[in-house]
């Protein structure tokens, strides 16, 4: 720490020094202050402590010292003196309190952080935008303020866009380089290539096309035989065509990106666009054209009841794709068939969209003629009227599919619809005599019979009794009064299988057609009861397949299979304005294998509580209006359940799964049903059955789990909506203010914690050992001081073992140091050199006065006086002069008297300084003599020994850096190589400034005292010292004169010196006076001449007459002139003799030039005379 404020007082006496000027000097280094600086000052960019900061600091500073070829001697601190231990004990208490405060601050910091996080969460939940600050609200915008950016540009980052674009360009460049090296390496069909942006793909493909066109022979050799040349040309043509196709696809993709918005907008309005194409106009750079193909508006098509639709009006029928339920076609006769088969529907879509988007658009007249021709052939019997009606319904159902349908539902609807349509068409052909007989393949019988009942509407109690509920896809039939026999169902199944065989596909059995032998058919008669529907209500009609046991074909066993309607869907959105709408009640038998039921039982919860929780209504999917739900219930032992269609009382209809069958009942029923199987059925292979049933079971379980997840999300959303918003009534401005306050508090707490950590840090013995190890590796000597390192460095300086000390601790002056280098390792400051002689002559501060300043300012041995700075301390020394501790004793005595006489009127003769000093507070026992004794007689090692320096061990230093710093060999060599290069350089030439001392330059660099109070105090101190030493000087001179007995002769030089104009000194300045007169002021020169001549005369007489006066008095006289010289500089008054001398100095120069002028005039006169 040193004496507080002492460097500020001494800065006027220091001057800059270049580090190169210190080359070859032996300097002592106080390493203790280094360790403290590294421990408390070295931090990273975030203010955190760096690991092994003391070693890192020592390493870099060692390299700097050796780079300038300085020979350092490091001094470590020893045991602290008693006074310093007391001071350290007080500091330790402050450190402990600081560590406790640091922990408390950490807790506060954590709480503040949590509060801020809670506020951020509240902001995110309450709004999406940041609240406006008060400055933004109250500020009035200037007229030149630009409008705010759009939201997209605010949230977008140019740097992120640039990074993404750079990544794309790098990927493109890599692909191009790879293609140029190996053209066969790039696969344009790969996923990586497809994921590239269209622009990049287009550019790469274009480059590939040009490359293959020009440089094909480089990577593909020409055929040796002429017969193979045609094959070579064909391969090239195919590759070119292959690239052209990809380039066209990429161009379409780019056009679609530009024109996709137009197409989406047109479709949202209800229209239909076949294709939209956008390309640039070649003649104009900024123009594009947009080609729209297949525009069809949203129109209501009214079909005449007498005319039947044909293939010529397919496009007109397709315009009802977006039409509402009120705008549906109403034919004269209700069609008796369902929508067409998938093959028929695909053919219709192909006819609507065209064979290829590349074909040029045909004219409207040509297309109408083609449609007339195709319509003539279609009327001949290719498409029946029922098929056209089914097509109309299929197109109408596309709109309903968005609400309650899915891809699986559409597939099943198309399969079922195709079977019904073809069955009706087969009946017509049979009536005309064109029927074709066909065979039906028997289906594998199922094991367990499960009755399926489908209900429309919501149940009254809203609860379900089923523990094993699952949903499947359903099919909507728009003919509620139609009754389909079992024979027709068998025909449909067989016809579907035959169609699959013709198309080359495996006959996948639809879930809607699964049959069992006729011996196990449990017929269910459908009872139809009309249900009254109130006006403006939405009715959902369900169609079930009625199985008639009275059917003669069924009784005769003509068709050995029975149909099973596996599922039915409620999707009709017809609205009735009034009247009654009869809704049929249908029930069908569902057959589920035993393995499927066992797998379902294993997948469901085992215990009763979980089963009870599992009994709930499962919503299939959410729809904005009418939502359909299905219910498939396991059969009861009593018999089949009936399916009713009820009117929906809520916004959306749903289907519930209800069952009261337990696991044991299911197992018993499955065993009973298995006993009814015939021997012939048992012998049939079951592989296909097991595969089908396992697949169906997996689908059912997966659907069940998906529905449960959807139900859970829906309940969570409902709970979130019902939950009240806790932040609704909170003012956002208050939250803003609170957040800003918390942020400011968090920053202040961080700074406070870092400061407390610095205070709590302390140097340990382990740090000393590690630092000494690093010094040994560099070959630098070090010593362990008995107590204070500063005192040991001062001792080395006093005994001339070193040329100075590198330190920033001002305590070294109090221990008697003479040369100190400061700011050597500060990059922002120059190296400053301080000498004891300089500030002794300029400020009048000797060692005793420096110790007195330590009493007043505070140091490592004393606390000092509060509110006392360097200026006030100098004023105290000026007000109470004396030697040693006399000034402080006088000051303490006066202060106690002033405190005792507070009530008495103040002394009118007191100065302003004393009036201020009355307010100070002195500690009891001030001043303590032990402090001065500790500075004047420190415990040091005064032995004189030689110091040796070695060369750095590079290998061991690299190992040390790797262990403590984590550096590799390369990084260590980067720091050591410049140092080793300078150490190994052999330089014998000396610098020019080593031969002489630039005294004039040093005087010019000397800084002036800026403070007027300090300047006045220093001037008074120097005058008083000169006055004190004047009697001593006169006593010495009188003693010398008495010994010579020539007192009168001694006065003669003073009288002769008044006639200085007659005395000339040799000078090399061409007629001007010597250097002392030119570089110094007249006062300085007069003082120097007066005192210097007396000293020189005293020396001559003492040497000539061999006086008995001791030689110890002479050095004191020699040391006195600097004080007298400085006194002459600082004081404003001087003697009359000095003024006369100054005048005579100016006069003496005139006669010299005047005589020359007289000589010149006399010479001219002589020439004229001659």
From Swiss-Prot:
Biased composition (Polar residues): 455-474, 659-676, 1094-1110
UniProt-annotated stretches for the region Spacer region: 79-784
Region of interest (Interaction with ERCC6/CSB), ranges: 1010-1170
Residue numbers covered by motif Nuclear localization signal 1: 1049-1065
Localization per record: Nucleus; Chromosome
Residue positions binding Mg(2+) 1: 30, 77, 788, 790
E.C. number: 3.1.-.-
Primary location: nucleus
Protein origin, superkingdom: Eukaryota
Matches recorded under NCBIfam families: rad2
Family to which the UniProt record says this protein belongs: Belongs to the XPG/RAD2 endonuclease family. XPG subfamily.
Function, as annotated: Single-stranded structure-specific DNA endonuclease involved in DNA excision repair. Makes the 3'incision in DNA nucleotide excision repair (NER). Binds and bends DNA repair bubble substrate and breaks base stacking at the single-strand/double-strand DNA junction of the DNA bubble. Plays a role in base excision repair (BER) by promoting the binding of DNA glycosylase NTHL1 to its substrate and increasing NTHL1 catalytic activity that removes oxidized pyrimidines from DNA.
Protein name: DNA excision repair protein ERCC-5
Organism: Mus musculus (Mouse)
Gene: Ercc5
């Amino acid at each position: 720490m040193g004496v507080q404020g002492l460097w500020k007082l001494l800065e006027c006496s220091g001057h800059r020094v270049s580090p190169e000027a210190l080359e070859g000097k032996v300097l002592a280094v106080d390493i203790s202050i280094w360790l403290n600086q590294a421990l408390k000052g070295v931090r990273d960019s975030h203010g955190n402590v760096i690991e092994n900061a003391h070693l890192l600091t020592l390493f870099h500073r060692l390299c700097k010292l050796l780079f300038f070829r300085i020979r350092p001697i490091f001094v470590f601190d020893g045991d602290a003196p008693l006074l310093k231990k007391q001071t350290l004990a007080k500091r330790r208490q402050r450190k402990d309190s600081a560590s406790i405060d640091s922990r408390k601050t950490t807790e506060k910091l954590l709480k503040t952080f949590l509060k801020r996080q809670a506020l951020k969460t509240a902001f995110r939940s309450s709004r999406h935008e940041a609240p406006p600050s008060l400055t933004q609200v109250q500020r009035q915008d200037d007229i030149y303020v630009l409008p705010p950016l759009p939201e997209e540009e605010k949230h977008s980052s140019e740097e992120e866009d640039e990074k993404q674009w750079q990544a794309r360009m790098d990927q493109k460049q890599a692909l191009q380089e790879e293609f140029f090296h190996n053209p066969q390496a790039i696969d344009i069909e790969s996923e990586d290539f497809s994921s590239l942006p269209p622009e990049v793909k287009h550019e790469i493909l274009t480059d590939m096309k040009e490359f293959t066109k020009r440089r094909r022979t480089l990577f593909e050799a020409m055929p040796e035989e002429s017969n193979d040349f045609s094959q070579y040309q064909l391969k090239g043509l195919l590759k070119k065509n292959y690239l052209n196709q990809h380039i066209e696809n990429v161009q379409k993709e780019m056009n679609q990106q530009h024109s996709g918005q137009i197409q989406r907008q047109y479709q949202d309005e209800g229209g239909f666009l076949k294709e939209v194409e956008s390309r640039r106009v070649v003649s104009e750079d900024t123009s594009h054209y947009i080609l729209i193909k297949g525009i069809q508006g949203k129109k209501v098509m009214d079909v005449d009841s007498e005319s039947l639709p044909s293939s010529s009006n397919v496009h007109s029928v397709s315009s009802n794709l977006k039409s509402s339920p009120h705008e549906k076609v109403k034919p004269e006769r209700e069609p008796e068939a369902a929508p067409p088969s998938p093959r028929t529907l695909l053919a219709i879509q192909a006819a609507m969209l065209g064979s290829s988007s590349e074909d040029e658009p045909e004219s409207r007249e040509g297309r109408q003629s083609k449609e007339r021709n195709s319509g003539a052939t279609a009327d001949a019997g290719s498409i029946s009227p029922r098929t056209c009606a089914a097509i109309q319904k299929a197109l109408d159902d596309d709109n309903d599919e968005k609400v309650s349908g899915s891809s699986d539902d559409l597939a099943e609807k198309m399969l079922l619809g195709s079977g019904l349509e073809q069955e009706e068409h087969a009946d017509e052909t049979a009536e005309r005599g064109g029927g074709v007989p066909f065979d039906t393949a028997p289906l594998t019988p199922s094991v367990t019979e499960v009755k399926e009942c489908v209900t429309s509407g919501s149940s009254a109690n809203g609860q379900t009794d089923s523990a094993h509920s699952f949903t499947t896809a359903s099919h909507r039939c728009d003919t509620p009064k139609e009754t389909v026999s079992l024979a027709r169902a068998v025909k449909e199944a067989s016809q579907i299988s035959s169609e699959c065989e013709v198309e080359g596909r495996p006959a996948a059995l639809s879930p809607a057609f699964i049959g069992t032998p006729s011996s196990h058919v449990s017929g269910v008669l459908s009872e139809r009861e009309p249900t009254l529907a109130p006006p403006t209500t939405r009715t959902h009609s369900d169609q079930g397949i009625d199985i008639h046991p009275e059917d003669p074909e069924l009784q005769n066993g003509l068709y050995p299979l029975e149909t099973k309607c596996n599922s039915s869907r409620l999707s009709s959105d017809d609205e009735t304005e009034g009247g009654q709408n009869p809704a049929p009640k249908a029930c069908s038998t569902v057959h589920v294998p035993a393995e499927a039921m066992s797998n379902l039982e294993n997948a469901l919860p085992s215990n009763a509580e979980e089963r009870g929780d599992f009994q709930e209504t499962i919503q299939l999917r959410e729809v904005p209006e009418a939502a359909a739900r299905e219910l498939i219930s396991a059969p009861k032992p009593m018999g089949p359940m009936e399916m009713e269609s009820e009117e929906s009382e809520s916004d959306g209809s749903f289907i519930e799964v209800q069952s009261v069958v337990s696991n044991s009942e299911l197992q018993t029923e499955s065993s009973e049903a298995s006993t009814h199987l015939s021997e012939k059925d048992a012998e049939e292979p079951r592989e296909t059955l097991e595969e089908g049933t396992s697949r169906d079971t997996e689908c059912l379980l997966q659907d069940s789990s998906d529905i449960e997840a959807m139900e859970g999300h829906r309940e969570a959303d409902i709970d979130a909506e019902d939950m009240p918003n806790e932040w609704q009534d909170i003012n956002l401005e208050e939250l803003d203010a609170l957040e800003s306050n918390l942020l400011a508090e968090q920053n202040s707490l961080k700074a406070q914690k870092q400061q407390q950590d610095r205070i709590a840090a302390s140097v340990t013995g382990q740090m000393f050992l590690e630092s000494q190890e690093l010094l040994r590796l560099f070959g630098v000597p070090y010593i362990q001081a008995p107590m204070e390192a500063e005192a040991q460095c001062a001792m080395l300086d006093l005994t001339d073992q070193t040329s100075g000390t590198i330190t920033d601790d001002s305590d070294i002056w109090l221990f008697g140091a003479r040369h100190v280098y400061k700011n050597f390792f500060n990059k922002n400051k120059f190296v400053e050199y301080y000498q004891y002689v300089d500030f002794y002559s300029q400020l009048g501060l000797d060692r005793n006065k420096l110790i007195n300043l330590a009493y007043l300012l505070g140091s490592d041995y004393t606390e000092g006086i509060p509110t006392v700075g360097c200026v006030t301390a100098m004023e105290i020394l000026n007000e109470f002069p004396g030697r040693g501790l006399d000034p402080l004793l006088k000051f303490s005595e006066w202060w106690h008297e002033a405190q005792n006489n507070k009530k008495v009127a103040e002394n009118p003769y007191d100065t302003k300084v004393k009036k201020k000093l009355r307010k100070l507070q002195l500690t009891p026992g001030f001043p303590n003599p032990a402090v001065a004794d500790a500075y004047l007689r420190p415990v040091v090692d005064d032995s004189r020994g030689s110091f040796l320096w070695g060369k750095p061990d590079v290998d061991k230093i690299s190992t040390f850096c790797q262990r403590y710093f984590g550096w590799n060999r390369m990084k260590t060599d980067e720091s050591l190589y410049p140092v080793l290069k300078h150490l190994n350089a052999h330089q014998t030439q000396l610098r020019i400034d080593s031969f002489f001392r630039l005294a004039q330059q040093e005087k010019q660099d000397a800084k002036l005292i800026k403070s007027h109070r300090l300047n006045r105090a220093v001037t008074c101190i120097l005058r008083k010292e000169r006055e004190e030493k004047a009697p001593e000087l006169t006593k010495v001179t009188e003693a010398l004169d008495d010994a010579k007995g020539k007192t009168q002769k001694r006065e003669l030089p003073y009288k002769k010196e008044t006639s200085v104009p007659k005395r000339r000194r040799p000078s090399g300045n061409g007629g001007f006076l010597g250097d002392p007169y030119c570089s110094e002021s007249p006062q300085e020169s007069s003082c120097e001449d007066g005192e210097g001549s007396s000293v020189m005369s005293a020396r001559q007489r003492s040497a000539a007459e061999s006086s008995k006066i001791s030689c110890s008095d002479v050095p004191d006289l020699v040391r006195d002139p600097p004080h007298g010289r400085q006194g002459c500089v600082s004081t404003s008054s001087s003697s009359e003799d000095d003024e006369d001398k100054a005048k005579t100095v100016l006069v003496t120069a005139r006669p010299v030039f005047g005589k020359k002028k007289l000589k010149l005039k006399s010479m001219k006169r002589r020439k004229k005379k001659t």
